[in-house]
From Swiss-Prot:
Domain notes: Has the structural arrangement of an alpha-helix connected to a beta-sheet by disulfide bonds (CSalpha/beta). Since the toxin contains only 2 disulfide bonds, it is called 2ds-CSalpha/beta.
Impact reported for R35A: Severely reduced inhibition of KCNQ4 (IC(50)=104.7 uM)
Cysteine pairs bridged by disulfides in the record: C43-C69, C47-C71
GO cellular component annotations of the record: extracellular region
GO BP: any one term: venom-mediated vasoconstriction in another organism
Source species of the chain: Scolopendra mutilans
Family: Belongs to the scoloptoxin-15 family.
Impact when changing R35K: No effect on inhibition of KCNQ4
An annotated Gene Ontology molecular function: toxin activity
The name this protein goes by in its record: Mu-scoloptoxin(15)-Ssm1a
Keywords linked to the UniProt accession: Disulfide bond, Ion channel impairing toxin, Potassium channel impairing toxin, Secreted, Signal, Toxin, Voltage-gated potassium channel impairing toxin
Phenotype for K63A: No effect on inhibition of KCNQ4
Region (Important for inhibition of KCNQ4) location: 33-36
Amino acid sequence: MEKKIIFLVFLVALLALPGFISTEVIKKDTPYKKRKFPYKSECLKACATSFTGGDESRIQEGKPGFFKCTCYFTTG
């Protein structure tokens, strides 16, 4: 019984591994002209509309800069 549980845990981990490897995080800048230093929430919305068609769940992080936002998002 214990060997079956260990085997199932190993199998699930093995099946989940390609999903972690296949996602690529991309870093791109997008201009933000409404504010000199935008809020983080404004950067997340700007990144989502610029690169993912409004899908905020694919945005990892949005870092504010001087009239820009640095966006980290996943493909797929």
